[in-house]
Every structure is written in structure tokens, then in C-alpha cells.
From Swiss-Prot:
One of its GO terms (biological process) is defense response to bacterium. The keyword Secreted applies. Belongs to the frog skin active peptide (FSAP) family. Caerin subfamily. It comes from Ranoidea caerulea (Green tree frog). This is Caerin-1.2. Keywords: Amidation, Amphibian defense peptide, Antibiotic, Antimicrobial, Secreted. Its main location: secreted.
Length: 25
């Protein structure tokens, strides 16, 4: 379903996004 797709995308994206956000905090 859609939530499954969003979950899969989040698992791939979050590991890359979190460090970038952390650098700006």
C-alpha cells in the first residue's frame, strides 16, 4: 500500500537527511 511505499522511502532517505539536519543544529 501507499504507507508501505512511504515507509520504504523513509528508510532510504532518513539516514541521509538526519546527518545533514544534525550538522545545522
Amino acid at each position: 500500500g501507499l504507507l508501505g511505499v512511504l515507509g520504504s522511502v523513509a528508510k532510504h532517505v532518513l539516514p541521509h537527511v538526519v546527518p545533514v539536519i544534525a550538522e545545522h543544529l
